[in-house]
Protein backbone atom coordinates (compact mmCIF):
# COMPACT_ATOMS: atom_id res chain seq x y z
CA UNK A 1 0.00 0.00 0.00
CA UNK A 2 0.86 3.69 0.10
CA UNK A 3 2.31 3.46 3.62
CA UNK A 4 4.63 0.65 2.58
CA UNK A 5 5.77 2.66 -0.43
CA UNK A 6 6.51 5.67 1.77
CA UNK A 7 8.40 3.48 4.24
CA UNK A 8 10.52 2.08 1.42
CA UNK A 9 11.23 5.56 0.06
CA UNK A 10 12.27 6.78 3.50
CA UNK A 11 14.49 3.74 4.00
CA UNK A 12 16.15 4.24 0.60
CA UNK A 13 16.71 7.95 1.25
CA UNK A 14 18.16 7.13 4.66
CA UNK A 15 20.60 4.65 3.14
CA UNK A 16 21.74 7.21 0.54
CA UNK A 17 22.28 9.85 3.23
CA UNK A 18 24.20 7.37 5.38
CA UNK A 19 26.38 6.41 2.42
CA UNK A 20 27.14 10.05 1.60
CA UNK A 21 27.92 10.87 5.23
CA UNK A 22 30.18 7.86 5.69
CA UNK A 23 32.10 8.51 2.48
CA UNK A 24 32.68 12.12 3.52
CA UNK A 25 33.84 11.01 6.97
CA UNK A 26 36.22 8.46 5.48
CA UNK A 27 37.35 10.88 2.74
CA UNK A 28 36.57 8.38 -0.01
CA UNK A 29 34.04 10.42 -2.01
From Swiss-Prot:
- Segments spanning the bilayer are none
Q: Name one GO cellular component term.
A: extracellular region
Keyword field contains Acetylation: no
Kindly give the Pfam families that the UniProt entry links to this protein.
Antimicrobial_2 (PF08023)
Tissue specificity, please? Expressed by the skin glands.
Subcellular location(s) of the protein: Secreted
Keyword vocabulary terms for this entry: Amphibian defense peptide, Antibiotic, Antimicrobial, Cytolysis, Disulfide bond, Hemolysis, Secreted
One GO biological process term is: killing of cells of another organism
SS bonds (residue pairs): 23-29
- InterPro entries in the cross-refs: Antimicrobial_frog_2
Q: Which family does the record assign? A: Belongs to the frog skin active peptide (FSAP) family. Brevinin subfamily.
The task this protein performs is described as: Shows antibacterial activity against representative Gram-negative and Gram-positive bacterial species, and hemolytic activity.
- Indicate what this protein is called per its UniProt record: Brevinin-2Ed
Amino acid sequence: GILDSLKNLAKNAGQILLNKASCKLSGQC
